[in-house]
Amino acid sequence: EASLRRTSHYDYWSNTVRRSILLDSKADILMYGMGENSILELAAKIKEIAKHSEDGFATSKEVAKIRGVRGTCYRTSKKEEIPSDAIFLPSYQEVSANTKEGKIAFAKSYIIQESNTDSISAKPLVEQTEERFLVQEPPSHPLPQEQYDKVMELPYTRRWHPMYDKPAANGKTGVPALEEVLFSLTSCRG
């Protein structure tokens, strides 16, 4: 869900454009897309930080300073932490304006984001919200076939989480949508 809310996004519940969830949350880093490579690289960087600390742990402040991991977003208020090749999106203030210009800015932002989804040619994206910047690193590279095959060969149970065994308010258990995809084949990810 964070992937869909990493930049300014339309919120159906409030019927407004909301700012990045990373700016509203207490998270240090947001990971988006297919995260296998990203999480391994991020874990290695955290492990390296922890190795040099007195207590063997990485602090939240140290983790929040990690940069350059594909498939992640971070926030900063320092312009010098923005990659030099970054593309600036229209700001949150522009895209959230409830005007014709605001809607055009939102559409422009979407087009820029959509044209930067290729892991080979994508550039970092930056969205300003007041004095802070959301920086989106380029997407993670796809897994090589051997690694992808290992992921697909994991012992998935095709079962819902045990918490859904408890009857809901309507007396039913399970996840009805699971029936539709129970015997589906993976043709793409994302």
Segments and roles (model prediction):
Residues 1-129, 136-137:
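Glycine-rich beta-alpha loop elements in corrinoid/cobalamin-binding modules
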Residues 16-17, 37, 142, 146, ...:
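Conserved active-site and cofactor/substrate-binding residues in soluble primary-metabolism enzymes
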Residues 34, 155, 185-189:
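Active-site proximal loops enriched in glycine and acidic residues that flank catalytic Cys/His/Asp
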Residues 42-46, 150, 154-158, 190:
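Generic, well-ordered alpha-helical scaffold segments in large soluble proteins
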Residues 68-76, 167-176:
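A glycine-rich phosphate-binding loop feature that marks nucleotide/adenosyl-phosphate handling sites
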Residues 106-108, 112-154, 158-172:
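Extended surface/linker regions that mediate inter-domain or inter-protein docking
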Residues 169-190:
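N-terminal pre-triad scaffold of radical SAM enzymes
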